[in-house]
C-alpha cells in the first residue's frame, strides 16, 4: 500500500477516500511491520488501520475471499508464502456457507504457485509453500486466484475449474522503469464478472 512506510497510512486513507468507490485490500510483504518477535506482530499496524487481514464478501453471484499469505519468520525483512492454520480454519468455515454454483475469487499477495523458471530465489518468498491445502478447499468451485508480488504477468490454468492470475506490481521494475521484468508496461488487472463468467484484461498505466 505505501511501500514499507506505515506512517503514510493516514495520508493514503485520505487520498483513496476521495475516490468514492469501495477499496478492498490484501496485505503484502511491504505492508508488514518488521522487527517484532512473532508473525502476529507483523500485521498489527496494518490491521489497526484497515481491519482483518483475512475476510470475505459477496457481490452478485461471486464470493470474494481475501487472505494473508505473507508469513513473517522473525528476521528483518524475511517472510515466506504460507497460510497459517487459523486462516485455514476460518476459510473452511467460510466456504461451508458458499454454494458450489457460486463463482469464487481468492485474493492474496504472494502467488499460490510459480513455475521454477519464474522464481526469483529459493527462500519460498515467491510462492505459497502449503498451497495444496488451499486447492483442496477450492475443489468443486469455479475458482480464480488473483495474486501479485511478482513483477511480471502470468495466467496459469491448473484444471478446468481453478485458475490463477498473477498480475505485475504497479511499480514495474521497482520504480526504476515504466516496464515490468517481462517487458509489459506498468499497469493493473481488470476483471469483468457476469454471472459465472469472468473476463480479464491488463491495462497499461
Whereabouts are the PLM-identified features?
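Short acidic, glycine-rich surface-loop motifs adjacent to enzyme active sites
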Residues: 1, 95-120
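Active-site glycine-centered loops adjacent to acidic/histidine catalytic or metal-binding residues
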Residues: 1-4, 28-29, 109, 148-149
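Extended active-site neighborhood of metal-dependent phosphoesterases/phosphodiesterases
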Residues: 6-100, 121-144, 155-190
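Short active-site segment of divalent metal-dependent hydrolases/proteases
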Residues: 31, 112, 152
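Short, well-ordered beta-to-alpha junction loops that form the rim of enzyme active sites
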Residues: 69, 107-111, 149-150, 203-204
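A short hydrophobic beta-strand element
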Residues: 106-108, 165-166, 200
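A short C-terminal boundary segment appended to hydrolase-like catalytic domains
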Residues: 189-205
Amino acid at each position: 500500500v505505501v511501500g514499507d512506510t506505515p506512517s503514510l497510512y493516514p495520508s493514503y486513507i485520505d487520498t483513496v477516500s476521495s475516490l468514492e468507490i469501495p477499496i478492498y485490500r490484501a496485505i503484502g510483504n511491504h505492508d508488514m511491520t518488521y522487527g517484532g518477535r512473532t508473525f502476529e506482530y507483523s500485521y498489527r499496524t496494518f490491521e489497526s488501520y484497515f481491519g482483518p487481514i483475512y475476510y470475505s464478501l459477496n457481490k452478485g453471484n461471486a464470493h470474494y475471499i481475501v487472505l494473508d499469505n505473507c508469513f513473517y519468520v522473525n528476521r528483518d525483512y524475511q517472510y515466506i508464502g504460507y497460510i497459517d492454520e487459523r486462516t485455514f480454519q476460518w476459510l473452511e468455515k467460510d466456504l461451508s456457507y458458499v454454494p458450489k454454483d457460486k463463482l469464487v475469487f481468492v485474493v492474496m499477495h504472494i502467488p499460490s504457485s510459480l513455475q521454477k523458471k519464474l522464481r526469483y530465489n529459493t527462500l519460498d518468498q515467491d510462492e505459497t509453500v502449503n498451497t495444496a491445502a488451499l486447492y483442496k478447499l477450492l475443489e468443486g468451485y469455479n475458482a480464480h486466484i488473483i495474486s501479485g508480488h511478482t513483477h511480471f504477468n502470468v495466467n496459469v490454468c491448473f484444471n478446468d475449474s481453478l485458475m490463477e492470475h498473477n498480475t505485475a506490481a504497479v511499480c514495474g521494475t521497482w520504480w526504476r522503469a515504466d516496464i515490468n521484468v517481462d517487458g509489459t508496461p506498468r499497469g493493473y488487472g481488470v476483471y469483468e464478472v457476469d454471472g459465472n463468467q469472468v473476463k480479464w484484461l491488463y491495462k497499461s498505466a
